[in-house]
From Swiss-Prot:
It comes from Homo sapiens. This is BEN domain-containing protein 4. Residues 311-321 have a biased composition (Acidic residues). One of its GO terms (molecular function) is DNA binding. The lineage of its organism: Eukaryota, Metazoa, Chordata, Craniata, Vertebrata. Residues 390-498 form the BEN domain. The gene is BEND4.
């Protein structure tokens, strides 16, 4: 044991480290009883350490870190010497993975938060642990180099790497689907998710310091006690680290779903990730560095996601763009805002009139109101009925009952009664009917100028007759010419001194049927000669 500790303290020289590895390759403690335990808890130690570069860039608050696997046979302070002794690149990963002193894996350019650190056991499954570390960092070159560093063959390590990658992808997809169902669009997630991630990072940092102490303690225990105590210690550490790994993995998946959909790299393309160790860790965005288990792609684009992309492609398309109608409404809102600004500027530029101008306008309005003759408006009396909603024309319920009962379901008779109730005798007598014909100049008639009937009342009566006959199909609807004829007849009878509609009662056979066209024509001709015809 002293011979093994001496070259470890001298420095990370590759030949000595490789020679010291050989006794551990031969020693197989409990080969028949604990193979499943070794496979289950065979995990590399992944600790967040900054890049050792010349000159080293200052890391951000949640700085991208390099994943370094620590062995229990050497104290951690010499890890930096081991890492700095190799040039950056895939060669450094191959040289570091083939040693039993800290096997340093190069950091990815994204620097996402990795799994918690756990020291690999001194067991024959070193190839599986190093290949798993290469799988987690999505570095095919590192996976191959880690496979060559163990005692197993290259084919076995490659098969394990592919199997681990397949298991990771399947597990990530299933976790993302379950979390998306549980989240329900993020409603069930707590708002302090980022704080939980920060606290998780702090816990990882403290656990790393504890693991350094464990490494020092493990060194003494390994040299003084038996292998059983060492295995029990490692078993307890692996148990704690496995639970921490699952917790960080779940938080990382939640943060991945919250931060947006990013394409996961295709494991088959090795050329994309050959230069990951040389990329500046500061080139990543804070969203990605807080994402935990996310993709190494630094681009924010959503194009060409691989088969292991966590969200569905339909969700990406929905989040990508708006519908054309939304874009039109957006532009319309912008144009309206600009128009409002222009109108506001114009309103502010208009000068306010002085008090003299305001007093003058007020005096003009008062004088105009004094000259106006207030016209008596048709105020609705008690129990009155409005013919149409849009017209201020009213009749009493008694008048309406009389008109309906006496019309015998004839639209012309109903119109005659309504004219009698709406217009007064003077309005009909001193009017020129509907105003469609001019007075005859040859008649030489002198007298007051005659004006047409109130167009509002005339229009209201026309519309009401049409509506009433349409809603009651058993009523006979008059034509436009017949409606005009009824108005002209009412004006003519008012000029003759008879009440409008008295002829309907006194001369019972005067308007009883349609066969009396001769009498109607005589009345029309007489009214036309007087100049009051339609």
């Amino acid at each position: 044991m002293e011979e093994e500790m001496q070259p470890a303290e001298e420095g990370p020289s590759v030949p000595k480290i490789y020679k010291q590895r050989s006794p551990y390759s031969v020693l197989k403690t409990f080969p028949s009883k604990r193979p499943a335990l070794a496979k289950r808890y065979e995990r590399p130690t992944l600790v967040e350490l900054p890049h050792v570069r010349a000159p080293p860039p200052p890391p951000p608050p949640f700085a991208p870190h390099a994943a370094v696997s620590i062995s229990s046979s050497e104290p951690p302070p010499q890890q930096f010497q081991a890492q700095s002794s190799y040039p950056p690149g895939p060669g450094r990963a191959a040289a570091a993975a083939s040693s039993s002193s800290p096997s340093c894996t190069p950091a990815t350019s994204q620097g996402h938060l990795r799994t918690p650190a756990q020291p690999p056991p001194a067991s024959p499954a070193a190839s599986s642990s190093s290949s798993f570390a290469a799988v987690v960092r999505y570095g095919p070159g590192a996976a191959a180099a880690a496979g060559t560093g163990g005692t197993g063959s290259d084919s076995a390590s490659l098969e394990l790497s592919a199997e681990s990658r397949m298991i990771l992808d399947a597990f990530a997809q299933q976790c993302s689907r379950v979390l998306s169902l549980l989240n329900c669009g993020g409603k069930l997630l707590d708002s302090n998710h980022s704080q939980s991630m920060i606290s998780c990072v702090k816990q990882e940092g403290s656990s790393y310091n504890e693991r350094q102490e464990h490494c020092h303690i493990g060194k003494g225990v390994h040299s003084q006690t038996s292998d059983n105590v060492d295995i029990e210690m490692q078993y307890m550490q692996r148990k704690q680290q496995t639970s921490a790994f699952l917790r960080v993995f779940t938080d990382s998946l939640q943060n991945y779903l919250l931060s947006g959909s990013f394409p996961t790299p295709n494991p088959s393309s090795a050329s994309e990730y050959g230069h990951l160790a040389d990329v500046d860790p500061l080139s990543t965005s804070p969203v990605h560095t807080l994402g935990g288990w996310t993709s190494p792609a630094t681009s924010e684009s959503h194009g060409h996601p691989s088969s292991s992309t966590l969200p569905e492609e339909e969700e990406e398309e929905d989040e990508e763009g708006y519908c054309p109608r939304c874009q039109e409404l957006e532009q319309e809102v912008i144009s309206l805002q600009q128009e409002n600004e222009e109108l506001r500027r114009k309103l502010e530029s208009i000068p306010v009139p002085c008090q003299t101008v305001l007093d003058y306008l007020k005096m003009v309005l008062q004088h105009h109101n004094q000259l106006l003759i207030p016209q008596p408006a048709d105020q609705p009396t008690e129990g009155s009925k409005q013919l149409l909603n849009n017209y201020p024309v009213y009749i009493t319920s008694k008048q309406w009952d009389e008109a309906v009962n006496s019309s015998k379901k004839d639209g012309r008779r109903l119109l005659r009664y309504l004219i009698r109730f709406v217009f007064t005798t003077d309005e009909l007598k001193y009017s020129c009917g509907l105003g469609k014909r001019k007075r005859s100049v040859q008649s030489g008639e002198t007298g007051p100028e005659r004006r047409p009937l109130d167009p509002v009342k005339v229009t209201c009566l026309r519309e009401f007759i049409r509506m009433h006959c349409t809603s009651n199909p058993d009523w006979w609807m008059p034509s436009e010419e017949q409606i005009n004829k009824v108005f002209s007849d009412a004006v003519g009878h008012a000029r003759q001194g008879r009440a409008v509609g008295t002829f309907l009662h006194n001369g019972g056979s005067f308007y009883e049927g349609i066969d009396h066209q001769a009498s109607q024509d005589e009345v029309f001709n007489k009214s036309s000669q007087d100049g009051s015809g339609d």
